[in-house]
Amino acid sequence: METPTYTSRMSKACVFCSIVSGAEPASIVVREDGLTAFLDARPVFKGHVLVVPDMHADDLAALPAAGIAPLFLLARRVAAAIEHGLAAQGAFVAVNNKISQSVPHLHVHVVPRTKGDGLRGFFWPRTKYGSDDERESYARRIADALAAG
C-alpha cells in the first residue's frame, strides 16, 4: 500500500503548490493560516472555489489531524461567502480522495448552487444492497477497519 504524502515543502510538479507559491496564476479569494482558496480553472459553475492546504498533502489521509478542522472551517466560510456574495441558494461541498481527484493535492470543492441549476445531487448512480446481511457485512468490515486503526 502506498504511503500518503504530506510535506512541509511544496512540490515543484504540483500545480496547486505552484498556485500557492505564486508561480502559477490563479484568482485567489483568501489566504490564511496555511490555507489558500482560489477559483477553479474549470468550474462546475462560476464561483466554484477550491480550498487547499498550502503544504502539499496528496489526499485527506496525508493531512495531519491538526490540519483537518482549519481546512473544513475555511470551506464552511467560503460556502457562506458564496451564498452571500454570489446570491447562491446553497453550496455543494466535496472532496475527491484519490479516485476522480484530478490534482493529487488535497482540495475541497465549494460549488455555488441554485435551484434548477441542472446539477442533480451526486454524479453517480445509486445502488442497493442485495440483502440486510450484505449491508451489515459492509458495515462490519468498515467498523473492523476503523477499530484496527
Where are these regions (language model features)?
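HIT superfamily nucleotide-processing domains
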Residues: 1-149
